[in-house]
């Protein structure tokens, strides 16, 4: 456990370290910048899913709005899943 994890008094507090990433989604109407926030939980509700990534914008807004996200046991898994989700649908904002 990382040192900061000892600040959590109870698992229900869901203490997490936040990592920020940026990516450019390239599409016909121009490039769109997405910020991805990855939370690294001390004690996740699901033991194999320590990392949760979520984009700052929705995609597919005109049909069925979707906020790209991804879970994983590593930061790479969660971040990669979120990037794939961003690229799955067009940004229509």
Where is each model-derived feature located?
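Stable alpha-helical structural segments in soluble proteins, enriched in small hydrophobic residues
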Residues: 74, 78-86
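Short intrinsically disordered terminal tails
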Residues: 1-2, 87-93
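Short stretches within intrinsically disordered, low-complexity N-terminal or propeptide regions
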Residues: 9, 18, 55-57, 80
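Negatively charged, low-complexity tracts enriched in Asp/Glu with abundant Ser/Thr
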Residues: 1-33
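A structural detector for beta-sheet-dominated domains
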Residues: 21, 37-41
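Local alpha-helix boundary/kink/capping signal
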Residues: 17, 59-61, 84
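A short, exposed loop/beta-hairpin motif centered on an aromatic-Gly-Thr core
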Residues: 59-77
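Acidic, low-complexity, intrinsically disordered interaction modules
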Residues: 28-32, 42-65
């Amino acid at each position: 456990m990382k040192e900061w994890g000892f600040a959590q008094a109870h698992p229900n507090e869901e203490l997490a370290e936040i990592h920020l990433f940026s990516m450019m989604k390239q599409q016909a109407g121009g490039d769109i910048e997405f910020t991805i926030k990855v939370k690294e939980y001390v004690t996740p509700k699901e033991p194999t899913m320590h990392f949760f990534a979520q984009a700052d914008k929705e995609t597919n807004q005109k049909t069925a709005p979707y906020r790209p996200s991804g879970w994983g046991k590593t930061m790479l898994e969660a971040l990669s899943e979120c990037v794939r989700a961003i690229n799955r649908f067009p940004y229509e904002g």
